[in-house]
Swiss-Prot record:
The keyword Lyase does not apply. It comes from the Viruses. It comes from Influenza A virus (strain A/Duck/Ukraine/1/1960 H11N9). Its main location: virion. GO terms for cellular component: host cell plasma membrane; membrane; viral envelope; virion membrane. This is Hemagglutinin. The gene is HA.
């Protein structure tokens, strides 16, 4: 059990050098929404989220994300003909859905 925990800790440290979006340390009183709580006071933060997008997305563990383009998630799942170019894509790291 201890070896498993040690291995997991080492693995997480090795993978911890990559940030796509998030917060970095600095004195601040910003409030953020987390996965489990809303309006959490952060005493050390700098917003790293970009206001302009470069057009590229981070790959995770060597897998590229799938971009739905003009297709909605529901349209992709339900088989909308507009989403036919997504047929056959069976492996991705995350889904990018454009706001319309």
């Amino acid at each position: 059990m201890e070896k498993t925990l040690l291995f997991a800790a080492i693995f997480l440290c090795v993978k911890a050098d990559e940030i796509c979006i998030g917060y970095l340390s600095n004195n601040s009183t910003d409030k953020v929404d987390t996965i489990i709580e809303n309006n959490v006071t952060v005493t050390s933060s700098v917003e790293l989220v970009e206001t302009e997008h470069t057009g590229s997305f981070c790959s995770i563990n060597g897998k590229q994300p799938i971009s739905l383009g003009d297709c909605s998630f529901a349209g992709w799942i339900l088989g909308n003909p507009m989403c036919d170019d997504l047929i056959g894509k069976n492996s991705w790291s995350y889904i990018v859905e454009n706001q319309s």
